[in-house]
Amino acid sequence: MKKIIYSTLIFTILISGMWACKKSFLESDPQTGVKFDANFFKDRKDFDGFMFGGYAEIQGAGSFFNLGIQQWIVDGGAMMQDIRDRSEQPYNLLSYATPTSTVSSAWQTCYKTIGRANLLLSKVQTSPGSLTDPEKNLLTGEAKFLRGFAFYSLAQRYGDAVIYLTPYDVADQAALSLARSPEAQVWAQVILDLKDAAAILPLNWDAGNTGRATKGAALAYLANAYMYVKDWPNAKKASQDLIALGKYSLLPNMRNLFSHLTENTAESIFEIQYKFVPGSKIAWSGQPNYGNFLNWFTGPLGAGAPYAIFGGQGTYPTARKLADSFDPNDKRRKELIKVPGESYAGETMAGQTYNIPLNITQKNSAFNAKWWTGAANQAGIEEWFWNQNIIVMRYAEFLLNYSEILFESGDVAGAYSNLNLVRARAGLANLVAQTNKEIFLTDLMKERRWELFWEPNIWYHYTRTGRAAKFLLDEYGLVMAPKFNKFPIPQGDIDLNPKLIQNTGY
């Protein structure tokens, strides 16, 4: 299928914050830092181009300073300690104690996305007749999904957040300098946006628009939002609406979920698109690439060509403790995690099989084969980039979420039935249904860890269910301060807006 590339090349990014901008012959949106001609929004192509910029923020393509969803994967896994084996590369929780760490980029990414959505919603309504009513409706649904997704991410990571719902005049500093709203109000806004989006968005897009938000994506995140506020009846309803679409299913082979050869499959609900662009560079040096960095980050240190990009960066090995926690018969362990002494035939190893030496430099670690597939086989700096998509929400995760929703709704049998669907794909026997909530949650969180390691949402299942501190103590002997259930607000934003109050403990 043809991929949609979330290109922002038609825009000039002039600022990184929301307040630092000035007037010129171009309009400037203070929320996004994007300048564009006052008459830019003339037709559907212009609206689509601006919309794609919202996806590009999530994608974080071609930039070390805003890795988008890639950095969110790393941050969550590092907090869990399942990324970077502690015996070789300890990752202290205090790395996240300062509001100048990498988690700042998530806050800024979300508000840039919200800014684009707000501006687009305003322009759609004031379009001078260049859009048909169905086009206006569709663009409205898509913009509300992106805004809802961004507010969802803010509430999930930071709790309280500033709720901006309209574009602002550049000179109106009072309108920009708002206080954070309580987390409950942020979730209420998420639900409003995603309900609207789910009612409008299509089941599928044509091949030329693969990757744009769909009805299924809106319903999946709507169900999750209801989980956060413990509205189990509505969470169940949204989940049932998604199942009724008849679109999604588990792939028989998990390897196909993490492959540049098989993307946008029946298991994918929301998937960020990447593409290798020959002759491109990283964002600060010419035309940016639209590949992701995870293959480069996860290749074993010193593996050599053609087994890893640049012979193996080894930035983020996987914790051996995670690898050892799997049932020996679990296909997920066999196919998606490798340890020294095992063999791996990645997709881009020139047809060769890599026998991982027992004395490899990172000999105490494991290696994540969800993203490590071998050398990218590109020239020079281009090899950093890889065109494998990143699935942000997939059906297996949805089924595990639905399992929790059903248990909380009193349907224990249904809860275990959905959990066991995921286990069956992994080659494991069914678990016997347990009515004790603590036993069920223990079963469920183990399954989430084994299924969703090195994916965007796993850490937040632990914080949402209040089990993060217990997990770190039981698995890694770490005492987690309560503040780490949420990330710190970027100090630069607090300096610009004194009404922003830092999260407790930071």
Residue locations for each model-derived region?
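Bacterial Sec-dependent N-terminal signal peptides
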Residues: 4, 16-42, 190, 223, ...
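An aromatic- and glycine-enriched ligand-binding surface/loop that stacks and positions planar moieties
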Residues: 22-84, 165, 195-196, 212-356
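Long, intrinsically disordered, low-complexity segments
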Residues: 21-22, 55, 80, 110-113, ...
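Conserved, well-structured interaction surfaces
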Residues: 44-52, 56-62, 83-158, 181-188, ...
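Flexible, polar/acidic helix-loop-strand segments at domain edges
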Residues: 90, 321-394
